[in-house]
């Protein structure tokens, strides 16, 4: 067992890193960290971790190696499993450190190129489950998906890319939660699991917000989407279209055109076009808050009620990303990235160009007025 640095200020009882050391040939637990950064992000193909250890007396020198298997637990709940990508030894100002960085189990699907071939009559559920099992992801949870008539695997195409295209054709999402690979819909309209507040009366206070950043961004918002597929004659044919009529009527023209994977002419392509238009709008409002890391675990794919009296925000948000961090200056902080819930976005989409078309309220609102105007 490596020497543990005797520094109670750095001791974090909530976080546990287990490493299966190839060099030492055993299972080791690490409880003390100088710094860490753990990203749980629904929109990345593989989540990432980064730990910094104070290496007093060379205590950790032989413990870590690239490709070592690791598991990360917060408050006794598994939040990530994966492998080490990089081990960095460094010293500065007379102190020695080790930085250990890596990604979760899904990284193997990214790092492996598929063998070029032509796949026929593919069952995506079976295909994805078999690939996950072959690359070390022990569990899958996949909604029923339609058969794919044909898929040509190109040279240099990753296993993850193939899975992503199959999932996208079904207008679904994919994500890894600890050791389970999911394909389905995000829980964007469930009842809030958490409530975050700032500036509210004491009887309304919940989890206090330390910092708040709300962005309204037009990048990636489309006025029109057209999905093309190939006809038997070899010519392109339109399979699905969708428009944001408010943008078009107001002279805001931002068209996106893309091709489909299959040519069965199903309603899937119209749904894909609609998703292009709505996805851009639904993600145009992005909220990032920070809180003190708590015993209560905060995870993505859940909703939260956020009330902030400074920006006049009172809405239900969907949690897309959670980052657990620790450093000497700030201590243990949880950063949470969110977008409005489906219901909140539906309300704003229907009211584009008016006060209700935004996530914030009137600057002059009292708290009672803010409380009465909840979105979502």
Sequence positions of predicted segments:
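Solvent-exposed, flexible loop/coil residues
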Residues: 32, 37, 42, 91-93, ...
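Acidic, small/polar-enriched beta strand-loop surface segments
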Residues: 2-14, 75, 164, 176-178, ...
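Short solvent-exposed strand/turn elements
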Residues: 95-113, 329-350
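Assembly/oligomerization scaffold segments
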Residues: 1-114, 169-171, 176, 202-211
């Amino acid at each position: 067992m490596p020497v543990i640095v005797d520094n109670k200020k750095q001791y974090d009882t909530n976080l546990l890193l287990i490493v299966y050391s190839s060099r030492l040939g055993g299972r080791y637990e690490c409880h003390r960290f100088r710094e860490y950064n753990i990203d749980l992000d629904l929109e990345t193909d593989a989540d990432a971790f980064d730990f910094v250890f104070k290496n007093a007396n060379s205590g950790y020198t032989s413990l870590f190696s690239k490709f070592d298997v690791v598991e990360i637990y917060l408050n006794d709940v598994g939040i990530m499993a994966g492998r080490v990508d990089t081990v960095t030894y460094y010293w500065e100002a007379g102190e020695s450190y080790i930085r250990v960085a890596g990604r979760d189990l899904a990284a193997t699907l990214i790092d492996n190129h598929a063998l070029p071939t032509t796949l026929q009559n593919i069952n995506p559920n079976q295909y994805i489950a078999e690939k996950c099992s072959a690359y070390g992801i022990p569990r899958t949870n996949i909604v029923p998906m339609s058969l794919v008539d044909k898929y040509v695997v190109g040279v240099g195409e990753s296993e993850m890319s193939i899975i992503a295209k199959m999932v996208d054709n079904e207008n679904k999402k994919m994500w890894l939660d600890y050791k389970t690979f999911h394909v389905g819909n995000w829980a964007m309209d469930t009842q809030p699991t958490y409530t975050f507040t700032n500036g509210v009366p004491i009887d309304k206070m919940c989890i206090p917000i330390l910092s708040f950043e709300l962005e309204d961004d037009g990048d990636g918002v489309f006025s029109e989407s057209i999905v093309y597929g190939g006809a038997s004659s070899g010519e392109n044919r339109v399979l699905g279209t969708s428009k944001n009529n408010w943008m078009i009527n107001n002279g805001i023209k931002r068209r996106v055109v893309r091709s489909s994977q299959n040519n069965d002419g199903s309603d899937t392509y119209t749904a894909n076009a609609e998703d292009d238009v709505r996805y851009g709008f639904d993600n145009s409002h992005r909220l990032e808050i920070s809180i003190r890391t708590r015993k209560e675990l905060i995870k993505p794919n859940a909703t939260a009620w956020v009330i902030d009296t400074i920006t006049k925000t009172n809405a239900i948000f969907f949690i897309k990303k959670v980052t657990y961090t620790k450093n000497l200056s700030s201590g243990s902080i949880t950063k949470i990235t969110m977008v409005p819930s489906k219901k909140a976005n539906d309300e704003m989409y229907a009211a584009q160009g008016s006060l209700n078309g935004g996530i914030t309220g009137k600057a002059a609102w009292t708290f009672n007025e803010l409380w009465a105007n909840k979105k979502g």
